[in-house]
Amino acid sequence: MSAICQVTGRQPGYGKSVSHSHRRTSRRWNPNVQRRKFYLPSEGRTITLNVSTKGLKVIDRDGIESVVAKIRARGEKI
C-alpha cells in the first residue's frame, strides 16, 4: 500500500536522521494512512480509500459525496 492519501494528497516527507556523533542517514516520515471503506448512498455501494487522519477530518466536514466528486474530478478512478 502506498503512503499517499487519496483525499489530501499527503505523502511521505524525506530528511536525515542525525546521530549523537552527527552521522547522517536518510529516513522518511510516513503520514498516518489507513485503508478505510466508505458507503456511497448515491451509488448504493462501498468504496475503499487510502486516507490520512486529516483526510478523515475532511470527509467528516465536507461529506463523502463531495470528497469523491473532487477525487473523480482530478481523474482518479474509484
Swiss-Prot record:
Spans annotated as Disordered: 1-28
Top-rank taxon: Bacteria
A GO biological process held by the record: translation
Xref: SUPFAM superfamilies: L28p-like
Ribosomal protein recorded as keyword: yes
InterPro entries documented for this protein: Ribosomal_bL28 (IPR026569), Ribosomal_bL28/bL31-like_sf (IPR034704), Ribosomal_bL28_bact-type (IPR001383), Ribosomal_bL28_sf (IPR037147)
Protein known as: Large ribosomal subunit protein bL28
Protein source organism: Corynebacterium diphtheriae (strain ATCC 700971 / NCTC 13129 / Biotype gravis)
